[in-house]
Amino acid sequence: MEPFLLLLLVLLPAIVLVRYAFTYGHRTSTMPIGPPTLPFIGNIHQITKKYTHIKFTEWAAQYGGLYMLKIGNGNMAVITDRRLVKEVLDRKSGIYSHRPHSFVSHDLITKGNHLLVMHYGDQWRTFRRLVHQHLMETMVENHHTKIVNAEAIQLVRDYMIDPEHHMAHPKRYSNSITNSIVFGIRTANREGANMRRLYKLMEEWSEVMETGATPPVDLFPWLKLLPQWLFNNYIDRAKAIGVQMETLYVDILNKVIKRREDGHNNGTFMDKVLDSQEKHNLPWHQLAFIGGVLMEGGSDTSSSLTLAIVQALIQNPDVQRKAHAEIDAVVGHNRSPVWEDFEKLPYINMIIKEGHRWRPILPLCFPHALGEDDWVDGKFLPKGTIVVVNTWGMHMDPSQPDDPAAFIPERFAKHPQLAPDYVPGTWERRDHYGYGVGRRICPGIHLAERNMFLGIAKLLWAFDFQPGEGPIDSDPVTGYHNGFLYCAKDYSCRPVIRNEVIRDTIEREYATATADVFSRFTEG
């Protein structure tokens, strides 16, 4: 062989490799800036596996409200700027409402039928439309609030008669509301079988969805060829979660179908979906998942936020005193707060908004994906870019007037309305981002607002929350579980009933709720 050809054969692969080393895994000059990258892997080595939102917030302080991470040769834009959230995720929602494909969550766990990870398209629109019809504000106001009010008085009674298990009571509360509305099957106590199965499932799914918990197979498909034991058997773990999920959802759906076969159509969400099956013709797996998804979304989020707020109340007795004074002046002790008291109890609304800000349940919004090329503030975002809204970073903005680490409800004194009222307004007026953004905003926002108001208002009406025997760690790292959902670790709590009149009122209202509301539902 000629020496020149031999040299060419040797140099050509080296030239190609060097070229890829300078391009693969690196940002182009037109993209937003970000942390320094390494050839081929980009920023993968720098993304923490735990409490990723805190690292993303540190980078936001260094690189600004929009920066780009390279995940291999893929792109991840992180937004920690309220103005950009409005201009990009809200105003351009048609191209920013997609989801990045996930081999683990989409293919292995949900088979693409979970509303949270579902790709943007006709199936998503059908699911969303069905959910909206049952959870729009008028439906919640006219049909669901009476259920919330009844479950909230049981929440108070549970704290009163069983303070030892205070961490479990908000979970029962939110799960029972959701299951009653969706299936007509309430959760009567903290030992409810459906609830226990759901929270076990959610805990395992949250862990596997945390950044870094599984190999980046969507960016490096060849990783699927490697033995899964190298990555903590992630395929088997994901499939097992999928089996748990499908089995639970199908079991509950079958109970609804059996009840209907016995001649009882209770007008629940699933009853209405089944009534419209001739029109929508949803496959069996989708039929099971549309109800299961609502059970998930309504159970874990409200309960986690309630636990965070109670924790904050224990550590801030002045906040409790102000709330007690407001409630006593409006409500008294012979009845508990009801939804009609909302406008007269603005401080309770401030406490809830501050809870959303202080410990958001989703510190990082579930990732969006860009459907086509876009330019944002003169920077290029290619089609397929993963877009992460850093809720934690926006809520903990150090430029705000009050200490972002402190629990100060008064920072929302100029936000007297419910969260949905601020979503369509200007970015300067948005209260918080606890329910997400754009077209992917939580479809149960109206129900969730009533869950939170009635739950927190009644708890504060009834109790003085004091420290129990044991630690109360509210640190955002050491005091909170790592995972996709952000929830407080167990903490001590001593709920002290405020007086005997309130105790008697609780028992009387609970008896009324049992007779008038709970009796309409089966238990599970």
From Swiss-Prot:
Location relative to the cell: Endoplasmic reticulum membrane
Ranges in the topological domain labelled Lumenal: 23-524
Cited InterPro entries: Cyt_P450, Cyt_P450_E_grp-I, Cyt_P450_sf, Cytochrome_P450_fung
Disruption-associated phenotype: Completely abolishes the production of patulin and leads to the production of a distinct dark-red pigment.
Use of this protein: Patulin was originally used as an antibiotic and specifically trialed to be used against the common cold, but it is no longer used for that purpose since it has been shown to induce immunological, neurological and gastrointestinal effects. Genotoxic effects of patulin with dose-dependent increase in DNA strand breaks in brain, liver and kidneys have been detected in mice. However, more recently, it has been proposed that patulin might also have anti-tumor properties.
Chain positions carrying an annotated carbohydrate: N266
Principal subcellular localization: endoplasmic reticulum
Entry similarity comment: Belongs to the cytochrome P450 family.
Cytoplasmic side: 1-4
Annotated protein name in UniProt: Cytochrome P450 monooxygenase patH
A molecular-function term among this protein's GO annotations: iron ion binding
Function: Cytochrome P450 monooxygenase; part of the gene cluster that mediates the biosynthesis of patulin, an acetate-derived tetraketide mycotoxin produced by several fungal species that shows antimicrobial properties against several bacteria. PatH catalyzes the conversion of m-cresol into m-hydroxybenzyl alcohol. The pathway begins with the synthesis of 6-methylsalicylic acid by the polyketide synthase (PKS) patK via condensation of acetate and malonate units.
GO BP annotation list: patulin biosynthetic process
One CC-aspect GO term: endoplasmic reticulum membrane
Reported cofactor(s): heme
Positions of heme binding: C442
Bilayer-spanning residue ranges: 5-22
Entry membrane topology: Single-pass membrane protein
Reactions the enzyme catalyzes: 3-methylphenol + reduced [NADPH--hemoprotein reductase] + O2 = 3-hydroxybenzyl alcohol + oxidized [NADPH--hemoprotein reductase] + H2O + H(+)
UniProt KW keywords: Endoplasmic reticulum, Glycoprotein, Iron, Membrane, Metal-binding, Monooxygenase, Oxidoreductase, Transmembrane, Transmembrane helix
Recorded metabolic or biological pathway in which this protein acts: Mycotoxin biosynthesis; patulin biosynthesis
Induction of the gene: Expression is correlated with the production of patulin. Expression is positively regulated by the secondary metabolism regulator laeA. Expression is strongly decreased with increased sucrose concentrations. This decrease is lost in the presence of malic acid. Expression is increased with pH changes from 2.5 to 3.5 in the presence of a limiting concentration of sucrose, 50 mM. Natural phenols present in apple fruits such as chlorogenic acid or the flavonoid epicatechin modulate patulin biosynthesis.
